[in-house]
Amino acid sequence: MKFRCPGALAVGTGFIKDYELLFKGSKTGSYLTIEEKKGSSVPVAIWKVDENHERALDRYEGYPSFYYKKEIEIDFISLKRKLPHRAKAFVYIMHEDRCLGIPSKGYLQVCLEGYKTFGFSCKYLEDALKNSMEVKHGNNNK
């Protein structure tokens, strides 16, 4: 984010409930997305962005052809004061017709670094990768 959106501010962390983390994509690569799944959750960083940041993110994420945006209400803990908050936010979600896939080592490393920066368990990424590997080897029907 600091490279794509200079001036954007990380304000908190939280969880998107009833969604799971997945690696999906196309022939050019597999990337993170979320899909609905009751009982699951996905850790997220909450960023304060302006309209210019949002336009830059739209271009970077391939909106609206690769990802679409969804507005959600999310509970989160502020980074500065560690207080609970609730806010409207937007998330990028890859179109559901994309297939599960295995990300590049470089992309996975960037994701791991982001998770570590915000203190998230890497188990979410490991589970998403395991799910993709099972599909590649025919052990899953997603």
Residue ranges with predicted function:
Residues 1-142:
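Glycine-aromatic micro-motifs
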